[in-house]
Amino acid sequence: MEIAMVCTRVSLLILILSLCSPYKFIQSPMDFGPLNLLPTTTTASSDFGRILFQSPSAVLKPQSSRDISLLLGFLSGSSLSKVTVAARGAGHSIHGQAQALDGIVVEMCSLPSEIEFYKGGEGEISYADVSGGVMWIELLEQSLKLGLAPRSWTDYLYLTVGGTLSNAGISGQTFKHGPQISNVLQLEVITGRGEIVACSPSKDADLFNAVLGGLGQFGIITRARILLQEAPQKVKWVRAFYDDFGTFTKDQELLVSMPDLVDYVEGFIVLNEQSLHSSSVAFPANVDFSPDFGTKSSPKIYYCIEFAVHDYQHKNTNVEQVVEVISRQMSHMVSQLYSVEVSYFDFLNRVRMEEMSLRSLGMWEVHHPWLNMFVPKAGISSFRDLLMDNISPDNFDGLILIYPLLRDKWDTNTSVVLPNSGSMDRVMYVVGILRSANPDDGCSHHCLQELLRRHRHIADTAGARIGAKQYLAHHPTPSGWHQHFGRRWEQFAERKTRFDPLLILGPGQGIFPRSNNAAYGS
Ligand code: FAD
């Protein structure tokens, strides 16, 4: 044991020297004692965005939390080293957030995929203990076997638990249960100092809160305890169309005010034929709606609300009746309400069906210049106008999601940044501009740069004018990050000093660039 530790330390020293050397010599798998450190791969330097490709010098495929602790413990103990480390979940970031230029990428999916359940009795909670590299789809598949499921989701499930908890994790259930970070009971985290810490709201709460929505800056999540609830067997899934933005948002706000009846609320802008039939693979209703989209100079756009009601077969709830009660209060376009009943699994896994369809058309592995923003309720109309001034509906490829969230479902002690709540509105919105740019369809370098420039303009203008904040944020400069955090910057930076003083973690976010051997704040 002792000998193994000494070997590991010596090997790590060689590693650090090799990474700091101008002549990188990691070309083949290296024996770093028990650490499975490998030469870089193309996967480690790419992500879903396909915009940035930063190559690390090595990849760690950890077999246990201890492997990560050894690596970080050694790097944080050596002021010699400038080596940075990024945890990589499923790599579904847009702007290289899980990349580490010339550093080490820790591939979280190499951790043994452990999922353990505790099923509470009547009146007790149920939960699952899962490794940080487990994907939500795996947790769903396993938990359904026990009739259970997490309460809060993302739209797409091929994302890791550690990856979404480092951001927030939102979807149509967020209005009811809060984001995924509001549904975690406990974490195991390896800090930037290499310490393995079990933390929760009552133990090492500051680390717990820092890591949730912490953009991978304070520690690597190796385990999480996720709250579960009874899973419905089926879901009644409804879509209703609107031709007026004010009516659309008013109805969305009505729906989120009825959490006893409604289980999911989202919505999207119908810009063109393609968005009208968005995710029609998963939503197999016969949509008999042929709107007039106007002309290029005078486009007409529409809106679609999606809501869902869970169907628990043993409860004998009449979901048809529940939908009827809800929809009677809505003001959608006449006859433009469609519904389908699908299994709970298919409902949650709906984006995977779209993925398979897009893959078969060669349209999945393209550039994704996405922009997500949290918008205060008071500014949602101006945000819509800003958006429409900066996109052309006739050639927009992708989806624009808009749906309301409720502030009081978010814990403001976590690291997540929301718009200031000056007006005390309980409602805020999330808007996701989920755009594809296909080089084979004429959108290569120049076109992509132009789309990114426009998104930056939207983000900057909406930030300055209406106090909107980016979700899954990307800021090219540290000063952009200072502005993003606003008055929360000091707390974020202080937590960094405490949990990752040598600025080793999360270099791809660009929040704390590592300058010459300085610890943050020194
Ligand atoms: P990665 O991209 O691998 O990592 C993201 C960040 O987290 C990086 O900074 C990384 O260093 C850090 N990180 C990763 N693992 C850990 C860990 N174990 N511990 C500490 N830090 C870690 N998001 C939503 O909220 N709602 C949605 O509905 C939604 N839908 C999406 C649909 C698609 C098709 C895609 C591509 C993305 C979607 N996202 C959504 C965004 C997604 O939640 C984030 O991009 C998330 O980071 C992806 O998880 P990942 O496992 O791929 O993380």
Q: Language-model segments: which ranges?
A:
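Noncatalytic alpha-helical scaffold of FAD-dependent oxidoreductases
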Residues: 1-522
